[in-house]
């Protein structure tokens, strides 16, 4: 029995992101969490849903028997499905738009047309280092509900996932270190307590405290706080490096 199947839900000749071929929405079978937002449906030329029957309802290869590995394997299957496409948007089923302002997406589309990239995230937590007035590089990435991934990068990720027996977390283990983001969070998710939430790395109570303090368990505008903190961490890193270099110079004297 095939544990995954696909359904096309929209096609357009006037996508918001002209440099993206396809959007794949990763959804559990029988889930009602996805909001059929016309903006999401028109992000790219074609939008499909990948339905996942789940490891409890459908026996999967590689002994997939826990939530974290099932999430990684689900991305792996989506990468297999999209082998013939160039840039692809991947959205988890609870992803939703924070900002609809078209000019933000136009800047992202222009960036993709002029620059090589591996992964662009529409909203993540991490350490942000400024590239220019609009874009940041992301280290220590967490949260992967909405990203654009290039064709070459998907091939590399699929191999790494399989070689690693689908262990780890999609964002922290596989996406980290090659990610860029826009200056504002654009496509976000809320973080109610779920089975997947309870499988995250790190201290569960610290994770939960951060979610409550930022408000992203109930209000998507809390992502503004996450982005402010992520940018601040990037600035602090630069300050730490400068202090280290100054101390090193004085030590050598």
Give the residues covered by each predicted segment.
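An acidic/histidine-cluster motif and surrounding catalytic segment
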Residues: 1-91, 95-253
